[in-house]
Amino acid sequence: MTTHQIRQKYLDFFSARGHEILASASLLPENDPTTLFTGSGMQPMIPYLLGEKHPKGTRLTDSQKCFRSQDVEEVGDNRHTTFFEMLGNWSLGDYFKKEQIPWLFEFLTKEIGLDPNRLFVTCFRGNDSLGIPRDTEAAELWKKEFESEMGNGKWEMESHDIKVVDFPERDGLQGGRIFYYDEKKNWWSRSGEPDKMPAGEPGGPDSEVFWDFGDKLRLHEESRWKDSLCHPNCDCGRFLEIGNSVFMEYRKRV
């Protein structure tokens, strides 16, 4: 399957679900002094996520051209590049997690044909000091999606194997399928973690999907992280992030 086919499948998938297809915004952001270049699909959507009405409605989808100069030092591994297109679907006060997560799972497994046995997901652990709760809703929705694959002849695990791991960066995979991380890994804003966000900046927890290249390639064992436990956000390269759902629920106060 080519990149063009994947792009078209994505846009068609969400168009069939009531989304208007948008053209890619400029790589040079308009009315956004926070960055030199458009570095994510989220960036051009910020005004509308803050309440401005979009002329195309409340359900939108696009393939946004992105440039990340900060990733130039990472080019050469199996996960980073400086220029890419980011596929996105946007809900402006319309649907939320209970629609987004099943749709993403359906697109990856049915439209693209990825093996669900190789998919692993992460959710936000929460931060008590900031009053931001653990995203148990996203974790439960993901669990239901994985459970829905049972009985189709392809799923290699049992229901009790859809395990949720609380501290994978400390404890490793632990046979898990769903993993909680803190705001260093599962939070999105243009500025990064909540303590780096300026007043007025929107942000929120996210839920990421990773593809597992498997242990047979020995990517972890032959990396410089071999003496630590592997997990979805390990830098060894065994796991590749292929999707991210951001839930923009917060705005930084003064």
Describe each region flagged by the PLM.
Residues M1-V254:
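Structured aminoacyl-transfer and RNA-binding surfaces used for tRNA recognition/handling
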